Design a protein with these regions (language model features):
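Outer-membrane beta-barrel proteins and related beta-barrel translocases across Gram-negative bacteria
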Residues: 1-41, 45-56, 60-424
Length: 424
């Protein structure tokens, strides 16, 4: 039978790791249990930070939710919240209701208590609303909103503390991530776009209130808008980029705008393949010189196969050309060739159950003259190769040896094991 009672019980829920003690457990059915005069926690037994103590807790594993009557939430044994009725999730299924509160303490802010509420708006939208009380600062409100539509999706996070009692100023943070596709009658493929925006009321916000919205821990917060289109063998994109500087790092250049384009011939073995990349950027800075950079890189390669495609030799050459024009009136140019020669072998051994592959490879990279434009507009250079970016080209003469091996299942092609080793 699936029903019955157990007195003076200690229980553990295997699927969630939740555990507790109960004066009596009433097993109503296979998936529905009632716990009388009971406790509930998901903390590790060695460190029980919080605990829910209730007159009765009912757990419905079929629905994925639990409910408590006359419940007290304790943190480190100290009662911090009483509620006559409380619901909480048992698994990942979505349902509107209160989530477990959090409690903390800092020397500056004092006691810190949050009580989040989850709102399951619709199958493709949800929100979490979190009132927060910080003893010496006041009351704040945070919100998270997520949405998923057929042609776009995104997430919005925001937090506001009106008139911080310690500083007398409004404190806030805001973060938006949105991306989607735009269908147009004139274009074969949709335009894709993405917006990333994050800002703070002040540079001390993250240290005062914590990084609870998942903002980057780097010294800058990203503020970008991108639109991209590709069709067959060509692609074009446009970018507007700014930053909010959090730490002591130097202010990066804004890109207002950056335009990229690329085209490549139809790639095939045993024939000459062509490609070209180009970029225009207007760099903007509040204190340094503004500038424009024009960059283009044509490339050509030939993938010569032999031994029934078990081996190949691939020579390639490219020419990176950059031109800089500064608002001070000065200009400079840089032109750097890049030569590569790559060769490899492909071995495979098949058994009744597996396919084992082995791919040794050798690659020679050569940039004849070390050059530098004298400019450094990119804190993190979006390198066009592993050896040089658009602002510099160090002299390079490198031979790289590598070997890769895979073990695949014959039944469905699943990669069971992959290893590689490389030495320059």
């Amino acid at each position: 039978t699936d029903s019955g009672t157990i007195d003076n019980a200690h229980y553990t829920i295997a699927t969630t790791g939740a555990r507790g003690d109960a004066k009596q457990i009433e097993m109503v059915s296979r998936y529905l249990n009632r716990y009388h005069n009971t406790t509930y926690t998901t903390c590790d037994p060695a460190e029980k930070s919080w605990e829910l103590q209730a007159e009765q807790i009912e757990m419905d594993e079929l629905e994925g939710w639990g409910s408590a009557k006359n419940a007290v939430v304790r943190f480190k044994g100290v009662p911090i919240l009483y509620t006559p009725s409380y619901t909480f999730p048992l698994d990942e299924r979505r349902k509107s209701g209160m989530l477990f509160p959090t409690w903390g303490y800092s020397e500056v802010g004092g006691g810190d208590f949050s009580a989040p509420y989850y709102w399951n708006i619709s199958p493709n939208q949800d929100a979490t609303i979190t009132p927060r009380s910080i003893g010496r600062r006041g009351l704040s409100l945070s919100g998270n909103f997520r949405y998923l539509n057929s042609d776009n999706h995104g997430e919005i996070d925001a937090s506001l503390l009106p008139s911080d009692d310690l500083t007398g100023k409004d404190r806030y943070q805001f973060k938006l991530n949105h991306q989607g596709d735009l269908e147009t009658a004139q274009l074969v493929n949709p335009l894709s776009y993405q917006i990333n925006y994050a800002t703070l009321s002040d540079k001390q916000y993250l240290s005062d209130f914590g990084n609870n919205l998942g903002l980057s821990s780097s010294d800058t917060l990203e503020q970008t808008a991108t639109i991209h289109y590709n069709q067959d063998r060509w692609a074009v994109s446009a970018l507007l980029s700014d930053h909010y500087t959090v730490g002591t790092a130097a202010e990066p250049y804004r890109r207002l705008p950056q335009i990229d384009g690329s085209w490549s011939s139809e790639s095939a073995n045993n024939q000459l393949n062509y490609s070209v990349e180009g970029q225009f950027v207007h760099f903007d800075h509040s204190s340094n010189s503004n500038a424009e950079r024009y960059w283009i890189k044509p490339s050509a390669s030939y993938n010569y196969t032999l031994l029934n495609d078990a081996a190949y030799i691939k020579p390639a050459v490219s020419l990176s050309q950059s031109h800089y024009s500064l608002d001070s009136g000065s200009s400079s140019s840089m032109s750097v060739p890049h030569y590569t020669l790559e060769s490899g072998l492909f071995f495979d051994r098949e058994t009744t159950t597996h396919l084992h592959t082995l791919e040794p490879k050798i690659k020679f990279n050569y940039i004849p003259d070390g050059k530098n434009s004298g400019h450094d507009f990119e804190t993190n250079s979006d390198d066009s190769s592993e050896f040089y970016g658009k602002d510099s080209a160090p002299h390079t003469k490198v031979v790289t040896l590598s070997v890769a091996s895979d073990l695949l299942s014959n039944s469905d092609g699943t990669k069971l094991l992959s290893t590689s080793l490389e030495r320059s």
